Amino acid sequence: DMGVLLDPISVMMLVVITTVSLMVHIYSFGYMKGERGVQRYYAFLSLFSFSMLGLVVATNIFQMYIFWELVGASSYLLIGFYYTKPAAIAASKKAFIVTRFADLGFLIGILILSFYTGTFDFGLLTADNASLAVPSLAGGSFLGLSAATWAMALLFMGAAGKSAMFPLHIWLPDAMEGPT
């Protein structure tokens, strides 16, 4: 089920995201003055903001993944904004490939987690309900590690790729080819 989760953490993140997004939009008026394709830039930037907002209010991990991918797509579009520059094209491709690799790990982690718990719902994946999931997650193993360990490691891999953490940080310096 799709929905909107408004708890104290998501509300705090909504305030942070909308404040930073507003500042970026305002700053962009001067930064992008005289540039060609300003409407396209604001469309990409707005898609990025919308995706971040959707990510933090998602009620389940699958809905979060949809917005997670939209963040990646809008990042790709923003990095490749100057599509006539070969360096911008190369940078956007590099970011796309590295983050898709990480996102694949994120997706596999989600699928492992949902397979063993039987749900995508955050409410059922919380500590209050962990006793329901722990026996099934601890039961399966691969290469000596439990299903829970694999799921969490793969989820972390996805987060590491999207946030440019080592060793999946290689795309970030090239991302400066887009409007910064």
Indicate where each model-derived feature is located.
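...captures the hydrophobic TM-helix bundle architecture rather than a specific catalytic motif
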Residues: 1-180
